[in-house]
Design a protein with these regions (language model features):
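P-loop NTPase motor domains
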Residues: 1-190
Length: 190
């Protein structure tokens, strides 16, 4: 689900669809986000597997490693990817960002960070970092309903509803794809 999550985050406000000449940066940022999510899911501690950790890791990877006296300085992200085996999926997902000039890579990382900025808020962090009771597979197989209640006085969090619905919908589509294009039960959104 790393690719689904990355696409949902990049598509905030239109994402790559409304990017025009900047489509490369949004597409590469989506791959970088998916790669980072995958790395944290595989190597991160259980309490580090959340969106704020993704932001922090990308921010840390923006820094340059200390150059070897004879070699050109590399970014930490390049060094990290070199440590992975060639067939590692995180390497493939980040390929567009990794196989480009250093300044372009920095722009891709900045694009990813700008999309993640929406999630840097204490209340948002509490919602996102400490698990959720929503399970797409369970939602598709058992009778269930999800009610989203938003405070009218704080409209700044409304974009989360859109993200939640997009994420759930994409996960449901992935589940349907795994089952020959069909779900066991009918799923409806109102």
């Amino acid at each position: 689900y790393a690719k689904i999550t990355a696409k949902t985050i990049i598509d905030i406000g239109g994402g790559s669809e409304s990017s025009g000449a900047n489509a490369y940066f949004y597409d590469a940022a989506e791959g970088l986000l998916a790669s980072t999510i995958l790395l944290l899911a595989e190597f991160g501690d259980k309490n580090e597997r959340h969106i704020v950790s993704v932001f922090k890791l990308i921010q840390d990877l923006l820094a340059k490693a200390q150059p070897d006296s004879k070699a050109k300085a590399k970014t930490y992200s390049s060094e990290l990817m070199e440590k992975l085996p060639p067939e590692h999926k995180a390497k493939w997902l980040a390929g567009a960002a990794l196989n480009t000039a250093e300044q372009t890579m920095m722009s891709v990382m900045s694009t990813a960070l700008s999309r993640l900025n929406s999630f840097l808020d204490t209340e948002m962090e509490q919602m996102l970092c400490f698990g959720t009771a929503i399970d797409a597979e369970k939602f598709c197989t058992e009778k269930s309903a999800i009610f989203i209640v938003l405070p009218e006085e704080d409209v700044s969090k409304y974009f989360m509803v859109s993200l939640l619905i997009q994420q759930l919908y994409r996960e449901i589509l992935a589940i349907a794809d795994e089952n020959g294009g069909k779900l066991k039960n009918r799923v409806m959104f109102y």
